Amino acid sequence: MTEDLPGLIRHFAGQKQKVFFVHFRDVFGDRHHFIETFHDEGPTDMYACMRAYAEAGFNGPLRPDHVPALEGETNDSFGYTNLGRLFAIGYISGLREAAYGRHPTNYRSA
């Protein structure tokens, strides 16, 4: 949706210090018509975004936003399935560990 999302993150989370809470997700499409994807399936370089948060010194809460359903889930609570959320948390944790470093005091869990 933007050509330089990591640059925007560094600007607003770092220089402006205007990011206080992050809903982390990826989508296909534009702001009018989009489909939410798993964090590792969309067009965005999610690691570059996480690295931008780290470089900006962001230390606030970060959580997955809506997630697609995995095989076997009913999707009764669209966007909030248990297995999809577990996958997202694991993926985000890996990105965060890679971007911020392994030591748990380098970031605060969301």
Predicted feature descriptions by range:
Residues 1-110:
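Histidine-acidic metal/acid-base catalytic patches
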